[in-house]
């Protein structure tokens, strides 16, 4: 999402290892160029069955290696009411974040608040925001249904086409309970959250990347998970990658040449004027996967004001999945993120 920053953070304090260590890497990294704790989920009202999507992200970055910043983005998609709510808060810290667990990260400005507490799959996500005059909020608690997935051939460091590397692991199925408030109504909800932890991400922005498409996919019939991405480079090329998590919990990385992601239709935002792919076709022949991913609701674009005259737009929201696995029909759910959508192969 921060790929549109005018001045990307410096990389001098990013430290890489051969293997990620979740017991340490869950915590903030001192003076990191860019890192985040990211949650997206599908939830249902326990009484009515109404479906909601949530996004929570806490960015941490250091522009000069001395003072840090935190940026939170929060959102709710109300499927039954066809509404989308989002808010963000950017704050500067007086010092550097310390590498401490459990996590206790928070932002607050005016009436907008966001916080994450916890560690290793057990979290509390709290958000309170205002969107176009309407208040929304949630408090969600999670426990993990499965171990963490270490991307990048199980090293916990994803290699983006050989020119950039970043730490990356996920909890792909966090059992979630809590409350959501939209339209003045407090709802009790349950469901599943996908949690991403990434660090040392400044290198991805500093090089040739102009934008990316990232998606998490949960397949119902085969009980499998997929993380996929398409990085778009300045020279007009794409880099693909991802991880396939099988029903038994084993997982393997997907190489760029194994993956095809094609735009099939588009939606143009009236707010930003940007055109986003509204339907994607995904093919992974080596694993006999053929999937179609479609926006569940087109109006899931977020606007983030980084500087007084700089506003960044990106799309992130719920998508429906259909297709085949080993020749058998499958359906599923997804969250898709699209940044800098106009910088893509034609």
Residue ranges and their predicted role:
Residues 6-346:
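Structured soluble/peripheral alpha/beta segments that form catalytic or ligand/cofactor-binding pockets
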């Amino acid at each position: 999402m921060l790929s549109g920053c005018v001045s990307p953070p410096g990389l001098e304090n990013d430290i890489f290892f051969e293997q990620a260590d979740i017991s340490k890497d869950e915590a903030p990294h001192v003076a990191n160029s860019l890192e985040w704790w990211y949650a997206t989920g599908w939830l249902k009202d326990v009484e009515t069955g109404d479906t909601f999507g949530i996004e929570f992200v806490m960015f941490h970055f250091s522009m000069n290696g001395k003072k840090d910043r935190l940026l939170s983005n929060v959102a709710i998609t109300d499927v039954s009411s066809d509404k989308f709510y989002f808010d963000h808060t950017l704050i500067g810290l007086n010092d550097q974040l310390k590498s401490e667990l459990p996590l206790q990260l928070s932002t607050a400005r005016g009436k907008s608040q966001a916080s994450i507490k916890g560690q290793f799959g057990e979290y509390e996500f709290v958000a309170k925001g205002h969107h176009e005059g309407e208040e929304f909020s949630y408090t969600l608690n999670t426990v993990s249904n499965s171990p963490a997935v270490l991307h990048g051939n199980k090293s916990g460091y994803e290699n983006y086409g050989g020119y950039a590397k970043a730490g990356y692991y996920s909890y792909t199925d966090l059992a979630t309970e809590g409350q959501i408030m939209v339209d003045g109504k407090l709802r009790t909800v349950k469901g599943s959250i996908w949690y991403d932890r990434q660090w040392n991400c400044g290198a991805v922005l500093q090089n040739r990347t102009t934008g990316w498409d990232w998606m998490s996919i949960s397949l119902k019939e085969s009980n499998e998970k997929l993380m996929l991405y398409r990085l778009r480079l300045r020279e007009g090329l794409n880099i693909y990658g991802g991880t396939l998590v099988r029903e038994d919990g084993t997982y393997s990385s997907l190489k760029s040449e194994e993956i095809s992601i094609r735009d099939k239709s588009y939606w143009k935002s009236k707010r930003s004027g940007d055109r986003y792919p509204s339907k994607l076709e995904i093919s992974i022949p080596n694993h006999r996967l053929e999937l179609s991913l479609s926006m569940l609701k087109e109006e899931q674009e977020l606007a983030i004001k980084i500087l007084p005259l700089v506003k960044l737009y990106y799309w992130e929201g719920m998508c429906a999945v259909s297709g085949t696995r080993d020749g058998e029909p499958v359906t599923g759910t997804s969250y898709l993120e699209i940044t800098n959508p106009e910088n893509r192969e034609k």
